[in-house]
Amino acid sequence: MIIWLAELLQPYFSFFRLFEYLSFRAIVSILTALGISLWMGPRMIKRLQMLQIGQVVRNEGPESHFSKRGTPTMGGVMILAAITITVLLWADLTNPYVWAVLAVLLGYGAVGFVDDYRKVVRKNTDGLIARWKYFWQSAIALVVAFALYAHGQDTAATQLVVPFFKDVMPQLGLMYIVLTYFVIVGTSNAVNLTDGLDGLAIMPTVLVAAGFAAIAWATGNVNFANYLHIPYIPHSSELVVVCTAMVGAGLGFLWFNTYPAQVFMGDVGALALGGALGTIAVLVRQEFVLVIMGGVFVMETLSVILQVGSYKLRGQRIFRMAPIHHHYELKGWPEPRVIVRFWVISIVLVLIGLATLKVR
């Protein structure tokens, strides 16, 4: 929005040329989203407390979590608000990639909102029926997948980029739709599974978003794309503004979500952020790098799959509890230790993911 205003005023005030620079808009995007989150935080927490919208804690969970019962949840609303407002202000709204990410962010946020509402307001611990949650996640992902395929069919935007191999970029064809579907839905649910401790999900989300900001910038710059032997995708650099908005909003939320948390993001935040990360990975053609950088999310998801599979096939559990962060809690690790160590793992994995762009 502001970029349009700047274009109108440029002939009269040279200062407004500054708004054309992606680097400037990326910086102010972080600051804007951070400011909105910090401003909304206390007000939203107070409002949630007044409405008695508190966290529902499973009785079979770790005993240390019983003290979290009643902590305000659905704080993801302020994350989505901060991201959306920031993107509308600072991004180029003629860019279809920006709208693709916003569509998934808000669509999945709506699904998560209904799920949270049923849990904490209707006092239904199961929330939205699983098949309906999966149906709406699938519907949104498929609509976006078909739209992106139609927009970039048989171009670099629908190639598969394989890490470590600079000349391996097969054209996916219709398999692009299938891959896009699984990346968006899978990442959304993976982030949701990770969101079980104070700050555990939001910090890796911030780190992965920061990593994708760098990747989006390189992918949208023909010189850097050629240098790194990755597909040059015109206009993908505008996703830098979206990624930095996620970074700023996430850091602002972390201010209130750090241990001991004053508010939880709920499904409205976790499903939306995961879906947005998956969409960005698809748009910049770095699905494999998402698996590396988002390794904490992958680890949490695999722990659940292995736990359920082992119990059904052998009647035995592999972990004391899944997702795996609960396993370490039950081993006696204090919650802050689990959180910070998972953060450290995430930092290392993001750096490895970025390194794969050069190691080819």
Curated annotation (Swiss-Prot):
Similarity comment: family membership: Belongs to the glycosyltransferase 4 family. MraY subfamily.
Protein name, as recorded: Phospho-N-acetylmuramoyl-pentapeptide-transferase
GO cellular component: plasma membrane
Gene name in the database record: mraY
Lineage of producing organism: Bacteria, Pseudomonadati, Pseudomonadota, Gammaproteobacteria, Vibrionales
Organism per entry: Vibrio cholerae serotype O1 (strain ATCC 39541 / Classical Ogawa 395 / O395)
GO molecular function: metal ion binding; phospho-N-acetylmuramoyl-pentapeptide-transferase activity; UDP-N-acetylmuramoyl-L-alanyl-D-glutamyl-meso-2,6-diaminopimelyl-D-alanyl-D-alanine:undecaprenyl-phosphate transferase activity
Topological relation to the membrane, as annotated: Multi-pass membrane protein
Function: Catalyzes the initial step of the lipid cycle reactions in the biosynthesis of the cell wall peptidoglycan: transfers peptidoglycan precursor phospho-MurNAc-pentapeptide from UDP-MurNAc-pentapeptide onto the lipid carrier undecaprenyl phosphate, yielding undecaprenyl-pyrophosphoryl-MurNAc-pentapeptide, known as lipid I.
Record-linked PANTHER family: PHOSPHO-N-ACETYLMURAMOYL-PENTAPEPTIDE-TRANSFERASE, PHOSPHO-N-ACETYLMURAMOYL-PENTAPEPTIDE-TRANSFERASE HOMOLOG
Pathway in which the depicted protein is active: Cell wall biogenesis; peptidoglycan biosynthesis
